[in-house]
Each structure stands twice: as structure tokens, then as C-alpha cells.
Amino acid sequence: MACGATLKRTLDFDPLLSPASPKRRRCAPLSAPASAAASPAAATAAAAASAAAASPQKYLRMEPSPFGDVSSRLTTEQILYNIKQEYKRMQKRRHLEASFQQTDPGCSSDSQPHAFLISGPASPGTSSATSSPLKKEQPLFTLRQVGMICERLLKEREEKVREEYEEILNTKLAEQYDAFVKFTHDQIMRRYGEQPASYVS
């Protein structure tokens, strides 16, 4: 009978022959509910930790800058064309102001000869000293030099705007990141803060 009982042992007696202790197996069901109850908190805490590990710079690296694909909007030819058009408008404005000063009866006597010299042609008897002062002035820069100056100013302005945009974007992302971390922490404390801490094996 003893041999038959020995041969008819079920699998329940196998842990006795295994190197693992049976106490460890009996404690496993008791710790399972605690670990299951703490699993949502652990998952939320892990999500918060992973979110806290990220920084606004990570989002900036993931999302390309909106200035990356923007090429130069104004070419050198367009800048030169705009300068020519602006120069023509300035000349027309000066002629209009000169004609208004010439036809205005309330203008002073010393401004009338100046207006005449600007708008009207010089009389044959006048000397070269009484010619228009605009004809005496020599241009300091050529048209190409003015275009290069304008192009450089536009590039400097574009870089300044880009730096200001990146700075504002970093500030806004940092504020959103802090608000998200605070919101996640408040949610964790509100949901699991009142529960007693349990040992998780």
C-alpha cells in the first residue's frame, strides 16, 4: 500500500521536491491583490515619471521649426526694383510739394525761390550757384550698394524675429509642461493619496 500510495502521488506534492520553498508559494496569492490594487497607481506614476523625464526641448526637436522651410521672400532683383519704385515715389512727392508751395499764396518769400528751383527749370540768366541743390548732391551709395544694405538689414531683422519667436515658444512650452506635470501630480494625489501605502513585492 505504501508503494501504491507513493506511485499515486499527484502533482500537489511536486513543490516538495522543487528547490523553491512552499511558503513563497502560499504568500503569492496574498500579495497579488495588493499588487493588483497598486498597479493603476504604479502605471500612473510611471506615466508621470516618463512625462517628467521629457522636457520642452524634446518637443522642439520633434517638431520642426516653422522657419525651416521659409526661404528668402525677397530676392536681390526684387529689392532693387522696390528701391527704384520708392525713389520714383519720393521724386513725385517732392515735385508735388514744390508745386503746392509755389501755388500757395500764404507761403513765405524765402521758400518760393527754393520751390521754383526744385520744380521749374532754371532761367538762362541764372548762374551755376543758383542751380538746384539736388543736382549738386552726389550720391553716397550706388543702387547696388543700397540694395545690398537693404538685403542685409532684412536678414538681420529676420534673424531677430526668429530668435524672438524661439524664445517665446520655449517659454510657452515650459509653461504648458509645468502645468501638465502639476495636473498629473494633483490627479495622482487626489486618487491615491488617501489610500494607505502597501508593500509591493
Swiss-Prot record:
One of its GO terms (molecular function) is enzyme binding. InterPro entries: Akirin. It is found in: Nucleus; Cytoplasm; Membrane. Polyubiquitinated. Polyubiquitination is dependent of UBR5 that extends pre-ubiquitinated AKIRIN2. GO terms for cellular component: chromatin; cytoplasm; membrane; nucleus; transcription repressor complex. A motif (SYVS motif) lies at residues 198-201. The modification Phosphoserine is found at residues 18, 21, 55. Keywords: Adaptive immunity, Cytoplasm, Developmental protein, Immunity, Innate immunity, Membrane, Nucleus, Phosphoprotein, Protein transport, Repressor, Transcription, Transcription regulation, Transport, Ubl conjugation. It comes from the Eukaryota. A motif (Nuclear localization signal) lies at residues 22-27. Signal peptide: none annotated. One of its GO terms (biological process) is nuclear protein quality control by the ubiquitin-proteasome system. Highly expressed in testis, cerebrum and cerebellum, and barely detectable in liver, heart, spleen and muscle. Also highly expressed in various tumor cells from hepatoma, glioblastoma and pheochromocytoma. Belongs to the akirin family. Molecular adapter that acts as a bridge between a variety of multiprotein complexes, and which is involved in embryonic development, immunity, myogenesis and brain development. Plays a key role in nuclear protein degradation by promoting import of proteasomes into the nucleus: directly binds to fully assembled 20S proteasomes at one end and to nuclear import receptor IPO9 at the other end, bridging them together and mediating the import of pre-assembled proteasome complexes through the nuclear pore. Homodimer. Interacts with IPO9; the interaction is direct. Associates with 20S and 26S proteasomes. Interacts with SMARCD1; promoting SWI/SNF complex recruitment. Interacts with NFKBIZ. Interacts with YWHAB. This is Akirin-2. It comes from Rattus norvegicus (Rat).
